[in-house]
């Protein structure tokens, strides 16, 4: 009899745990939904830039080797330091470009997600730019841009 009560009590406690977990998840869905789409766009942009980087490197390697695939002059050109310096310079420029775009996108993503009340008030920031308290147009522009990018991504899939 006591074992049966323990089993029933255990089942009741487990079912209450599941009910509480589903209620918490149901309450968190709107809160997470506000950020999930922007996080998806951020991850999508990062993957897009990485694929462009690998595609660029692959095309760069093909353009260097496909000009004269069996030419003995090609080995002499590769053995000189000029070609390697050019190749290293192009890869370095690509890395600088990718780092700057990744930095700008991550800065935009995190600044729009985690705005604080102190940053909204009108003041002069470190770059001597006046910030105003009217951010409604910026928010509407950001939401419009996010929805347009969402339609673009949905259309391209």
Swiss-Prot record:
The keyword Transmembrane helix applies. Disruption phenotype: Displays increased levels of spontaneous RAD52 foci in proliferating diploid cells. The chain crosses the membrane at residues 7-29, 34-56. Residues 30-33 are lumenal. It is a multi-pass membrane protein. Induction: Between 15 and 30 minutes due to fermentation progress. GO terms for cellular component: endoplasmic reticulum; endoplasmic reticulum membrane. Residues 1-6, 57-157 are cytoplasmic. The keyword Transmembrane helix applies. It comes from the Eukaryota. Coiled coil: none annotated. Its main location: endoplasmic reticulum. Keywords: Endoplasmic reticulum, Membrane, Transmembrane, Transmembrane helix. It is found in: Endoplasmic reticulum membrane. Is probably involved in a pathway contributing to genomic integrity. Present with 4280 molecules/cell in log phase SD medium. This is Increased recombination centers protein 23. It comes from Saccharomyces cerevisiae (strain ATCC 204508 / S288c) (Baker's yeast). The gene is IRC23.
């Amino acid at each position: 009899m006591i074992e049966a009560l323990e089993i029933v009590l255990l089942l009741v406690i487990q079912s209450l745990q599941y009910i509480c977990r589903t209620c918490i998840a149901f309450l968190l869905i709107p809160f997470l939904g506000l950020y999930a789409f922007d996080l998806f766009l951020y991850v999508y942009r990062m993957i897009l830039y990485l694929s462009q980087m690998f595609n660029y490197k692959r095309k760069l390697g093909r353009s260097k080797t496909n000009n004269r695939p069996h030419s003995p002059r090609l080995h002499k050109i590769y053995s000189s330091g000029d070609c390697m310096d050019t190749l290293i310079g192009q890869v370095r420029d690509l890395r600088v470009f990718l780092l700057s775009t990744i930095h700008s996108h991550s800065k935009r993503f995190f600044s729009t997600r985690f705005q604080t009340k102190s940053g909204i008030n009108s003041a002069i920031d470190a770059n001597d730019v006046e910030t105003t308290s009217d951010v409604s147009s910026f928010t509407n522009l950001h939401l419009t841009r996010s929805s347009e990018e969402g339609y673009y991504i949905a259309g391209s899939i």
